[in-house]
Amino acid sequence: MSRWQRQQGCWCLWPASAQGLIEFIGGSYLATNPQISYRRLLEGLAARQLAVHAWSYVPGFDHQLQAREGWQALRACRSVLNQRLKKDLVPVRVGHSLGCKLHLLAPDGGRNSLAMAALSFNNFTAERSIPLLGTIAPSLGVVTEFSPGPEETLRLIERYYLQPHNLVIRFGADQLDQSQDLMQALSKRSGDQSQFVAMNGDHLTPASAGLRQGLLGDWADDPARARVIGSLIESIGNLGLGLERQ
């Protein structure tokens, strides 16, 4: 396994002979160090000969701006990899929680990708997402809602998101998931081929196995969560290798 390296604001894992590319955006503050938070998932994908680019960011209120920043960082990173490989890899975009929203708001509307995997799509208001915001924000005179807000986000997806191939994954015990809202918006588009998959787990399942392994070591691993991560790696890996639609 190659080592993580920093490129263009992203954490990158490049197998010796990459056969595909994963462009990953994590959720909320987990995405500050995705190479740690999502270690098990991302390294599992790299083991399938998929290059992994994970954008590192601190979440803010302007999600439209951050969607553009993430898209630009991942595009720049992809250019470095393609020059190195002397071939063009078309990515599968993978998002977790807020990361799904940022991918869906990308300036190219998903056109320059093979597919997208959306894990635990989350589209709550800022007040719902950030405890006490509604109480303290007025006194501080700060912005109290994400841009775009929840309803506008779904409208933009329905109107401007052009990628037909999407794998929307919901974890059964996830109290923050809004995948059904996403599926409804996607299904209203002409030619939509999105698929919905339910798995065991909760909102932190994509990240928790990596966190436990990184902080406590393999002895603290949770076999049930590891099995779910294995299923995620298989499903996303098949997308990345172009096997899902064969």
Please give the residue ranges for each predicted region.
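Residue in the alpha/beta-hydrolase core beta-strand immediately N-terminal to the catalytic nucleophile
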Residues: P91-V92, A115-A117
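Gly/Ala-rich beta-loop-alpha elbow adjacent to hydrolase catalytic centers
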Residues: P91-H103
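Short glycine-enriched nucleophile-adjacent loop
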Residues: C100-R111, M116
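Alpha/beta-hydrolase active-site loop
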Residues: F61-D88
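Catalytic active-site module of serine/aspartate enzymes centered on a nucleophile-bearing elbow/loop
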Residues: S208-Q246
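Catalytic histidine neighborhood in serine/cysteine hydrolases
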Residues: R189-L215
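The feature captures the conserved acid-bearing segment of alpha/beta-hydrolase catalytic domains
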Residues: L13-A16, A115, T125-Q195
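Short, surface-exposed "cap/lid" segments of acyl-processing enzymes
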Residues: R3-P59
